[in-house]
Amino acid sequence: MEGGVDARFYAILVTSGAEVNVATIIAERARALGLDIRSIIVPPRIKGYVILEAHDPGDVYDATRGLRHVKRRRPLILKFEEVMKLVKPEVEIPALKPGQVVEIVAGAFKGMKARVIDVNQSKGQVTVSLLEPLFRATATIPIDEVRPVEE
């Protein structure tokens, strides 16, 4: 083997909800049979697929042959970039500045408006002062739970 240069990614269609079980069985089978399955990925955002990294498609076939929850015999070949899109979290952090008015879109204060006091990008948190007339308070919440309000 040339150190992963020619390894490919194969998407296996499985029963939705059985991805982790299938991945575990494939890992045990690959270890027992000495198959060259380099990695097994259960994508968090896509149900019904397990992704295998292997040099030889025959190893993928041997690892999945006869498994109960595998729906299709022929796996889909994926490019590295496609796998990275599935695995890498895409978090869009809004650009917030102190003094800006935001709406809280999740959590205990959902639906309330607040004014930004401080933004901590490294921790992914924002400190806000709630603007509700009956409920004046300061809270530190995750930055992905707020959305800027156009004034």
Swiss-Prot record:
CDD domains referenced in this protein's UniProt entry, alphabetically: KOW_NusG (cd06091), NGN_Arch (cd09887)
Keyword hit for Transcription: yes
SUPFAM superfamilies documented for this protein: Translation proteins SH3-like domain
Biological process annotations from GO: regulation of DNA-templated transcription; transcription elongation-coupled chromatin remodeling
Gene Ontology molecular function terms on file: translation elongation factor activity
InterPro entries from the UniProt entry: KOW (IPR005824), NGN-domain (IPR005100), NGN-like_dom (IPR006645), NGN_dom_sf (IPR036735), Rib_uL2_dom2 (IPR014722), Spt5_arc (IPR011590), Translation_prot_SH3-like_sf (IPR008991)
Pfam families for the chain: KOW, Spt5-NGN
Residue ranges annotated for the KOW domain, each copy included: 98-128
Annotated keywords: Transcription, Transcription regulation
Family recorded in the similarity comment: Belongs to the archaeal Spt5 family.
Record text on subunit structure and interactions: Heterodimer composed of Spt4 and Spt5. Interacts with RNA polymerase (RNAP).
Function, in words: Stimulates transcription elongation.
UniProt name for this protein: Transcription elongation factor Spt5
Species annotation: Aeropyrum pernix (strain ATCC 700893 / DSM 11879 / JCM 9820 / NBRC 100138 / K1)
Lineage: Archaea, Thermoproteota, Thermoprotei, Desulfurococcales, Desulfurococcaceae
Name of the gene this protein is made from: spt5
